[in-house]
Amino acid sequence: MVTKYTSPVNAYRLFKLLPILFLIIWVADSGDYQTKVYTRAILAGLCFSIVGDFLLLFPTQFKSGLFSFLTGHIWYMVAFISCDWSVPILPTIIIIILAMGMISQLYSTSGKLKIPVLVYITVIAGMGITAFGRLEAIQSTPAIIGAMGATLFMISDCILGWNKFKKPFHLAEGIILLTYYSGQWMIAFSTMK
């Protein structure tokens, strides 16, 4: 009975969820979520992220986890466009080129997940563009931190996609977790004044 709850697999699952849980609690406690759409949308994105993290712990739930993260990215986009916003020309061009590159590399190797992967890459690119649009309009420290967080999240997802659908590589898991948690922390921190 004790082994069931203290096995390395269950410990890994617990520790994988804790950082995002702490961010949810921190933003709910510290952020101005009652009056600011931005903070409420980031909080919603974090909640969908922790659900996605949980689902991705089970290989059979990859599509559900992908959908949960996709929903989280949409909430982040809502947050980024809820403030002043401007079209960020150069970041948009760069992100679109990178997204098209990822689609061209992963589309043929993603099997039955071709359409979900295509939609997911499109949405995460949109999340990055909206984060830089907020930065373009506001040019504040929280906007810089939010754009940096979105960039790290995009990097994390690109490495995850490459590792899963194209070619697994040795350090992928560590790099994915480092960029993912750093990105989420920065996005959460962007709610602070």
Task: Give residue ranges: language-model regions.
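Polytopic alpha-helical membrane-helix bundles and their juxtamembrane interface segments
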Residues: 1-193
